[in-house]
Regions:
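Transmembrane beta-strands of outer-membrane beta-barrel pores
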Residues: 52-58, 183-189, 276, 300-308, ...
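Outer-membrane beta-barrel domain signature, strongest for Gram-negative TonB-dependent receptors
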Residues: 33-64, 182
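Extracellular/periplasm-exposed beta-strand and loop segments of Gram-negative cell-envelope proteins
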Residues: 63-66, 127-156, 188-274, 304-335, ...
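Outer-membrane beta-barrel "beta-signal"
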Residues: 22-26, 383-397
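Cleavable N-terminal export/targeting peptides
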Residues: 1-43
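Residues on the lipid-exposed face of transmembrane beta-strands in outer-membrane beta-barrel proteins
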Residues: 160-168, 181-183, 278-286, 298-302, ...
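Surface-exposed strand-loop-strand hairpins of Gram-negative outer-membrane beta-barrel proteins
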Residues: 56-157, 194, 333
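Short loop/turn motifs that connect adjacent beta-strands in outer-membrane beta-barrel proteins
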Residues: 33-46, 165-179, 190-192, 287-294, ...
């Protein structure tokens, strides 16, 4: 009986001991609550905008003066047998010779005595032969004295733009604000041509033809003519005879005339380049729906512009070829200003969308100058009132 009570007592003791050990064990692992999973999802804070920008061209103006003149190689006014070059021809020392036989039987050539004539000359236009039978040669120059300023709006240009906006949070209940920075590239292209006022100077040298009428222009002396001759044995051979028209080897007179007109000289101004815009500022966005929103932005803009300025001067004289001169200059400039834009944006997906908007930009102006010994031209490029449209795609990340 005692043994039974002992066994029963030990059973109760071990039962209580096991129960106490189970109570001291760690509680079972709880299943995580995923009801607030949205708090752990990454929300994109940045938006990249990539597209094109079509913007009005800068206002440009052109002005300046220049000189068109070939190097004067007409020689002295009265000297004989000189090398002379004109715009419409040339006169050189006489090249005629006589042939004599030396004591040893050899043929020797000697220059003919100076008889006031030359057989080496050329002319290019029939107008040089005067009605009273003389030959004239000319050198021309044009001093451009035009004071007009010609203004022109450069054509619109389309270029690429890239910008990134970083969401800074709520500004008001329905307004978000962000910081935006971007770059864009657009062209500069303007050209015009016009007649310009100029002072025209003509130097005319008159030469004696000794009653001869020269061949039709263009003509170059000495000249010869070939003919076919039949020999006594029936064969043929070619015979060459000199038919040069002789000219006086010194000018009879030199005359200089100067007139002013606005029809003989034509200028063409051309400006070609591009400008790179960097801009940064705050942006405010109004959310209409979950997909549709509008934003406005304004801030600083800096422009790096590079342009090539070319002026082509041309003068069509009465005789001879056109006289043309081209002068050019290249320059680069930095300019600081401001911008403003308004944009509508539609989100097609959570990450991508489309945008369209209007832009305004004012970044000052700069002058480009061509300065040479014979030209001084100025072009003004005004980048202070540019406006246009922008459109493209958005990417959130």
């Amino acid at each position: 009986m005692k043994s039974l009570r002992l066994v029963f007592s030990l059973g109760i003791f071990f039962t209580c001991l096991l129960q106490a050990q189970e109570e001291r064990q760690a509680p079972p692992t709880e299943i995580p609550d995923f009801s607030n999973l949205d708090e752990y999802i990454y929300v994109p804070k940045s938006t990249m905008l990539f597209g094109f920008r079509n913007i009005s061209g800068p206002k440009t103006s052109f002005s300046g003066k220049g000189k068109l003149a070939l190097e004067d190689k007409s020689g002295s006014a009265t000297g004989s047998n000189e090398f002379r070059t004109y715009h419409d021809g040339s006169v050189a020392p006489d090249g005629r010779t006589t042939v004599s036989e030396s004591s040893d039987g050899l043929s020797v050539s000697f220059p003919v005595p100076n008889d006031g004539k030359t057989n080496t000359w050329a002319y290019s236009d029939d107008k040089q032969f005067t009605s009273d039978g003389y030959m004239t040669f000319h050198n021309y120059s044009a001093q451009i004295i035009d004071t007009n300023i010609r203004s022109l709006n450069a054509g619109r240009s389309s270029g690429l733009e890239l910008s990134v906006a970083y969401d800074m949070g709520k500004a008001f209940k329905r307004l978000d604000w962000s910081l935006i920075a971007g770059v864009s590239l657009n062209d500069i292209a303007a050209s015009t041509n016009d007649k310009v006022a100029a002072r025209l100077t003509t130097v005319t040298d008159t030469y004696n033809l000794f009653g001869q009428r020269p061949p039709i222009a263009p003509y170059s002396a000495p000249s010869s003519v070939s003919s076919s001759v039949t020999n006594s044995d029936g064969t043929t051979s070619s015979d060459t005879a000199d038919n040069t028209t002789l000219l006086g080897n010194a000018p009879l007179a030199r005359n200089t005339t100067t007139i002013t007109d606005s029809t003989s000289v034509d200028n063409r101004w051309k400006l070609k380049g591009s400008y790179f815009t960097m801009r940064a500022g705050p942006s405010v966005t109004l959310q209409f729906t979950t997909r549709f929103k509008a934003s406005v932005s304004a801030g600083l803009a800096m422009v790096y512009a590079g342009s090539n300025y070319t002026v082509v001067e041309s003068f069509e004289p009465e005789t001879g070829a056109e006289i043309k001169e081209t002068v050019t200059d290249e320059t680069t400039k930095f300019r600081l200003g401001y911008y403003a834009d308004a944009t509508l944006q539609f989100d097609a997906t959570e990450r991508t969308g489309f945008y369209v908007g209007a832009v305004y930009q004012a970044t000052g102006s700069y002058d480009q100058v061509i300065a040479t010994a014979n030209a001084n031209y100025v072009s003004k490029i005004d980048l202070s009132n540019l406006n246009g449209l922008r459109a493209g795609m958005t990417f959130r990340f």
